[in-house]
Amino acid sequence: MSHFPKLLSSQIAFDVARTMLDGFDKHYRLFREVSVRAKALFEAGDWQGLQQLQRDRIAYYDERVREASVILEDEYDAENIDDEIWRQIKLHFIGLLTNHHQPECAETFFNSVCTRILHRSYFNNDFIFLRPAISTEYIENEESPTKPTYRAYYPGSREGLGGCLERIVHNFQLDAPFEDLPRDIGYVVRAVGEHFGDFRIAPNFQIHVLSSLFFRNTAAYIIGRVINGDKTYPLAVPIMRGADGQLRLDTVLLRPEQLLILFSFTHSYFMVDMEIPSAYVTFLRDLMPRKPRAEIYTSLGLQKQGKNLFYRDFLHHLQHSSDKFIIAPGIKGLVMLVFTLPSYPYVFKVIKDYFPPPKETTRELIKSKYQLVKQHDRVGRMADTLEYSDVAFPLSRFDDALIKELEKHAPSMVEYQRGADGSDEIVIRHVYIERRMTPLNIWLHEGTDAQVEHGIIEYGNAIKELIAANIFPGDMLYKNFGVTRHGRVVFYDYDEIEYLTDCNVRDVPQPRNEEEEMSGEVWYSVGPHDIFPQTYGTFLLGDPRVREAFLRHHADFFDPAMWQAHKARLLSGQTHDFYAYDASERFVNRYGDSAPGNAATPLRRAAA
């Protein structure tokens, strides 16, 4: 039952609400400035600057939340404001959002500040935004008509598809020359023709393109959609910058599954300038209807909004399901206790209180490793994690075996309380949540020969891409990797992760005598950061099918020279290009230097 006041009589309530909104507005202004800065760094080819910008931006939100919390404590003694005033604060905040362009994100910021000040017994819709209050539908950027959320183009007109695409590219006003834009436009037109074949143009044939570029790694992406009749198709064009400073269109992505991979939870967040983020999410959801809005917000760099939406979706699922949380199937970890809800496609990971040998780590060190992954370029090979504190679950939904495991291995992380409805709850004090995947060891054990080969190709590629991004996984057992819905192999166990540049890549020394040669134990000295690629075959090549596929596709994996070459390149300051699509899709591999052909549209107009 709601206890909202009938009258808004408190000046303090309004001032507190205004202070919180000012804090959010400052955050979002800085957030947008990062995206504008990303364009200049891309044009200059300053990849280290882009990486640093990405890392810095992740910290902005928490910095502004702390800043706002301190102001409220210092100026309004927020911890001692009574309940009636807090209810008025929320209502004033709602009123201030009436014409706001990012109301959903502002509500989340409000929650973040309040949960730093209020006890968790206040975490209900009377005091925070457990549910959204302001609709984000049809918010328009009326103050800046020159830059709408997206622009519409009509390739069925006289200029044709080629001219239309060229205008799309020029409208982004990139301050760097193209190597050969007519050639690249020709490639795009050719690829469109090959993909759609005999494509008849309907009267409503048009292309919508989001007004801002999407920056990530060393690429800038044009994101749009093609509308023809009652069909909508994705359109994504990555722009790359060569060593000579010239730009090129690298490929065109036209399949829904390609867009899903581009916006996957295994990639770093995009930097994109959005006046109205909800409009971008709506646009992208039209192209990826099965992708949760939470994941789209997160991929756009609004990870706190994504986290908030995920939790709302999770609570909704709990209300409409009855299965129990259970210990996750598979090999139990030494560091994490992992559980899952079978009807929900995620796993929950709790750091244990004690770590048996040979693990030598601490809770804080493990958390720092997960933060490292959050801030690093995940290059499509490391799963993103959602981190929560003090999460209350219905105790009746926990399997008895799971409760015993939690009390045995992580007692400091478990509390019990009475819920608002009088039911018993179990509170997990700290938990990571990740997408559930098929463990690679199970995939390899149960798969067909073709699946085993695919899994090993992907595993080798994943490791090579990770070390190219300066990530050494540490524990490379197959159980620490998962296979996504799209068949990509992804790393998800981060407690032993290191920078490759901090590792000493070594050859196994030659034995000095027969005793050393026959020894079943390591007889040579091993430093804390030493790695020996020649020894990896011992625990990776036991299965004959795996061994055959591994040596056929990744024989260099066990050669220290391959690892050392990556380390040397990183130490020299070189940045690797990572592609969120198969290399065979790149125009340089698909068409080479072949003539692009006529850039006129190959599409035929449908009969009226």
Swiss-Prot record:
Q: Which GO terms describe its biological process?
A: glucose metabolic process; glyoxylate cycle; tricarboxylic acid cycle
Q: State the reactions this protein catalyses.
A: L-seryl-[isocitrate dehydrogenase] + ATP = O-phospho-L-seryl-[isocitrate dehydrogenase] + ADP + H(+)
Q: Which InterPro entries match?
A: AceK_kinase, AceK_regulatory, Isocitrate_DH_AceK
The enzyme's E.C. designation: 2.7.11.5, 3.1.3.-
- Please provide, in alphabetical order, the Gene Ontology terms of the cellular component aspect for this entry: cytoplasm
Q: Tell me which residues this entry annotates as catalytic.
A: D384
The protein's GO terms of the molecular function aspect are:
[isocitrate dehydrogenase (NADP+)] kinase activity; AMP binding; ATP binding; phosphoprotein phosphatase activity; protein serine/threonine kinase activity
Subcellular location field: Cytoplasm
**Coiled coil: which residue ranges?**
none
Pfam families under this entry? AceK_kinase, AceK_regulatory
* PANTHER family the UniProt entry points to: ISOCITRATE DEHYDROGENASE KINASE_PHOSPHATASE (PTHR39559:SF1), PTHR39559
Q: Which family does the similarity line name? A: Belongs to the AceK family.
Record function comment: Bifunctional enzyme which can phosphorylate or dephosphorylate isocitrate dehydrogenase (IDH) on a specific serine residue. This is a regulatory mechanism which enables bacteria to bypass the Krebs cycle via the glyoxylate shunt in response to the source of carbon. When bacteria are grown on glucose, IDH is fully active and unphosphorylated, but when grown on acetate or ethanol, the activity of IDH declines drastically concomitant with its phosphorylation.
Q: What is this protein called?
A: Isocitrate dehydrogenase kinase/phosphatase
**Which species does this protein come from?**
Ralstonia nicotianae (strain ATCC BAA-1114 / GMI1000)
